[in-house]
UniProtKB/Swiss-Prot annotation:
Taxonomic lineage of the native organism: Eukaryota, Fungi, Dikarya, Ascomycota, Pezizomycotina
Official protein name in the record: Endoplasmic reticulum vesicle protein 25
GO biological process: endoplasmic reticulum to Golgi vesicle-mediated transport; Golgi organization; intracellular protein transport
Listed GO CC annotations: COPII-coated ER to Golgi transport vesicle; endoplasmic reticulum; endoplasmic reticulum membrane; endoplasmic reticulum-Golgi intermediate compartment; Golgi apparatus; Golgi membrane
Family: Belongs to the EMP24/GP25L family.
Gene expressing this chain: erv-1
Cytoplasmic topological intervals: 207-216
Record's keyword terms, sorted: Endoplasmic reticulum, ER-Golgi transport, Golgi apparatus, Membrane, Protein transport, Signal, Transmembrane, Transmembrane helix, Transport
Amino acid sequence: MASLKSLLSGFLLLAGAAQALKFDLEATSSHHSNQRRCIRNFVNKDTLVVVTATLDGYKGDGMNVNMHISDSHGNEYGKAKDIAGEQRIVFTSHHDAAFDVCFENYLTGSKYVENPRRHVELDIDIGADAKDWSAIQATEKLKPLETDLRRIEELVGEVVNEMDYLRAREQKLRDTNESTNNRVKWFGMATTFLLIALWGWQIMYLRAYFRSKHLI
């Protein structure tokens, strides 16, 4: 039993080994899309996502930080304006798609800012990692080992779903490639046939021309 617990703990530690992304967000005096700082991630359809951003500073410090989440299909998952401290946005994805978590930092002009930047710590939890397992354990009255097994089961299921998605995408790309090759083949054959027909027509035309001139 002890070895099983150690194995489960090691697996969960490996699965949750991703650390928070930390960066400094410099403030600007104008609003331009190219001054956004965006972090992109991929998520499968109907997957729970929890985005947690922790910023230093405070409201009214002369900077205004906005956060915006959207995916490549144009779905809007959340907006938060003038954030400071911890900000959390929870959503469920609508498509198999990449989503962007974007930040903007603008100077408000209300006061002088000596060091116009905010430090951001960003956590993005997806799928099983986004669930509150302590609450699940309490609600369903699970033992710690049962909770770990449940979490591992969901993590493995996510890996299987990801592999199925990649396999389906590979098959789609293969079908597209084969379709393109067939089109190129038929286009090449049609081009060759047209060139042969044009060559034959030119010979017949020249023969008729020379006969009309009594050259042959």
